[in-house]
Amino acid sequence: MNKDFPRITYVQWDVGSHVSFKDTVSKTVWSAITCGMLALQFFLGSPMGFKRNRVSEEEVIKVRELCERFPIHIFSHYPYVSNLAGSVESLAWNGDPTQDSKTNSILKELEYEVNIIGRLGGVENKRSGVVIHPGNYKDRKKGLLTIAQSINKISFKGNAKLLLENSAGSGCSLATTFEEIKEIYDNVVDVKKKHIGVCIDTAHIYGYGLYDLSKEEEIYRLFEDFDKIIGLDKWTLLHLNDSLAPFGSKKDRHAELGQGHIWGNNFKSLLTLLSLCKKHGIPAVLETQPSDMFVLAQLGDENLN
């Protein structure tokens, strides 16, 4: 994921990038705003460890003031190593106290992060949330149910929102299809459903072989299917990545826009994707290089002309 961002001009869509954490959340958000971003994502701590940085009340006030002054959507990404199902070999909440203790530790930090991000970005007409890879388990049915059971143990407050990200399907990874995401959602208790959203990653969905996003008609089918199975009101964020991995490879390999298998030949379907996201109020976050923001700025200029 990219670290440093040059100042850019104007992008007509609600797009930003994953950014490095700049000492405090307010500095991190401000760095994105000054680069012309309308959305950002960051790690509130190590991407490979569960201890999250604490955010002071002073910081909460500063960030909320920025959100009220500028059109910015705020997201964080929970550590890659999280697994709400427990582990590949041992389910949580299935009589293994050691595994349950580990999962409880993950949930404690996740609960803090999802509630603090909800406070930071929970401003009217702005989207926010914590993106998470739901988990892995060898028995898909049991794994999906256990993920929902873990979510049910979280005490959500206010505008807190947890975003389930689709996976590319490698190994025992879960949430590969809309149906699997819906199965998790359906098993979340009703009172907590409003705190659950979805993050769709274009590289993952292409790598799994669900939709060939290089084709315009597949973009429309993607939106139609999501609306039919889950509901577009639950689609909170788009991870906008090209794919180094071929279609249906079950591999997660991000590429810069125009440098992969999806948009290496043309950007026509990308324009359709961005247009539909704008129509439905879905912000997008890039996870590769700063140059992608320039690609989108240029693409927007050409589209206007």
Model feature map: region roles:
Residues M1-L107:
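N-terminal pre-domain/capping segments
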Residues W13-V19, L38-F42, I74-Y78, V130-I132, ...:
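Hydrophobic faces of well-ordered beta-strands that scaffold small-molecule active sites
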Residues G16-K22, G45-P47, P79-V81, G135-Y137, ...:
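Active-site beta-loop-alpha junctions enriched in small/polar residues
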Residues W30-M37, V55-F75, E111-N125, I151-N159, ...:
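Acidic (Asp/Glu)-rich catalytic clusters
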Residues N53, E89, W93-N104, K141, ...:
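Gly/Pro-rich active-site loop or hairpin
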Residues E68-R69, N83-G197:
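Active-site acidic/histidine proton-transfer and metal-coordination neighborhood
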Residues K279, P283, E287, S291-F294:
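Short, charged alpha-helical segments
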Residues D292-N305:
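C-terminal helical cap(s) of enzyme catalytic domains, especially alpha/beta-barrels
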